[in-house]
A protein has these predicted regions:
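Acetyl-CoA-dependent GNAT
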Residues: 10-16, 21-80, 110, 141, ...
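Conserved acetyl-CoA binding element of GNAT-fold acetyltransferases
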Residues: 80-92
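Conserved acetyl-CoA-binding loop-helix of GNAT-fold acetyltransferases
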Residues: 90, 96-109
Length: 152
């Protein structure tokens, strides 16, 4: 399958079941078991035009085979828009076919059409396959990511 046979579009209500399957598989890949509340909550965000998360899906032969979730966030270094790609996943059966590249290009086009700015994302240090794609499409930074859980 070539990249030209992949269609990228914004997620729609009819994608719910397949998105849930793929998002669950994404969680397994990162050793996370998403419960129903998380799946329902994220899907609600995706369908809410007022929520900052925008979801794109990749279709091949009429089947959703990947997704990307992106959100605008203020960039204090530029006093303008910035973008964060929260999630990107391709069905393992379709990896290497251009799904990830097509999704990233669609996300970048979306950011450009909505004010531009820097698009950032993270990946696991051992996700070398994804890093090979990302190294072709973006600049690897020297930033180190930290996390701290807060109550609320």
């Amino acid at each position: 399958m070539s990249e030209s046979s992949i269609t990228i579009r914004q997620a729609s209500p009819g994608d719910a079941e397949r998105w849930r399957e793929l998002f669950t598989a994404y969680g397994v890949f990162y050793e996370t078991d998403f419960d129903g509340a998380v799946l329902d909550g994220v899907w609600t965000w995706i369908l809410d035009p007022e929520h900052p998360v925008t979801a794109f899906v990749a279709e091949a032969d009429g089947t959703v085979v990947g997704f990307a979730h992106v959100r605008m966030q203020p960039d204090t270094f530029l006093a303008g828009p910035g973008w964060f790609l929260d999630d990107l996943f391709a069905d393992p059966a379709h990896r290497g076919s251009g799904v990830g590249t097509a999704l990233l290009e669609a996300v970048a086009d979306h950011a450009s059409a909505n004010g531009g700015g820097t698009l950032r994302w993270i990946t696991a240090a051992d996700n070398e396959r994804a890093q090979r794609v990302y190294d072709r499409l973006a600049t690897r930074t020297t930033w180190v990511t930290y996390e701290r859980e807060t109550s609320g």
